């Protein structure tokens, strides 16, 4: 169901930032910005700084509740305190998630939760020390491999939700 509600953003003085509070808005609700420019043209645009997006071909931003994640990296952070860059070799595996795992029949892509254990097993087996994920931010065109970013802080919805990404 599409409900068109229009609210005005308010500028935060001396910051270049605009803000808005919408009573009743909740996680899962979709939204876009309406931009009116000279000449009377109007554009509807997704939030480039949102945390989630609709799965393509839809293009709205989605309100995401990111508070329900329990970090489990204290051991890593403790080790990192004493790590000296340059004292150990680095081997980076650059990967595009869309070509790493074959999705189940009827799916365009595998889910982050399905991909994660397979990536970990592979990089450990091959001796890589780091992983660089290509095309992980939201982008409109599959063929771009993520080089046309439209959501800088939204992990692409092709592979699941922000909660799936944090798995």
List the predicted regions and their residue ranges.
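Short amphipathic alpha-helices and their capping/turn segments at secondary-structure boundaries
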Residues: 79-83, 116-127
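Amphipathic coiled-coil/heptad-repeat helices and related helical stalk/stem segments
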Residues: 115-116, 165
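Residue-level signal for pocket-adjacent positions within structured domains
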Residues: 4-5, 39, 44, 58, ...
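The feature marks proteins involved in alpha-glucan
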Residues: 12-94, 99-107, 114
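Beta-strand-rich binding/interaction modules
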Residues: 1-7, 31
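Short secondary-structure boundary segments
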Residues: 1, 67-69, 75-76, 128-135
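Aromatic-lined carbohydrate-binding/catalytic grooves of carbohydrate-active enzymes
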Residues: 102, 110, 121-166
């Amino acid at each position: 169901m599409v409900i068109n509600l229009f609210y005005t953003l308010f500028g935060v003085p001396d910051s270049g930032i605009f803000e808005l509070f919408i009573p009743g808005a909740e996680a899962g609700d979709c939204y876009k910005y309406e931009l009116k420019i000279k000449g009377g043209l109007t554009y509807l645009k997704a939030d480039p700084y949102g945390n989630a997006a609709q799965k393509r071909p839809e293009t709205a931003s989605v309100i995401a509740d990111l508070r329900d994640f329990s970090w489990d990296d204290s051991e890593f952070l403790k080790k990192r305190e004493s790590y000296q860059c340059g004292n150990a070799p680095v081997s980076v595996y650059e990967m595009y998630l869309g070509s790493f795992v074959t999705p189940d029949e009827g799916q365009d892509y595998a889910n982050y939760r399905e991909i994660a254990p397979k990536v970990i097993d592979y990089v450990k087996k091959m001796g890589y020390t780091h992983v660089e994920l290509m095309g992980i931010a939201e982008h409109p065109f599959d063929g771009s491999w993520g080089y046309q970013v439209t959501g800088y802080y939204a992990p692409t919805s092709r592979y699941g939700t922000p909660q799936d990404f944090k798995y």
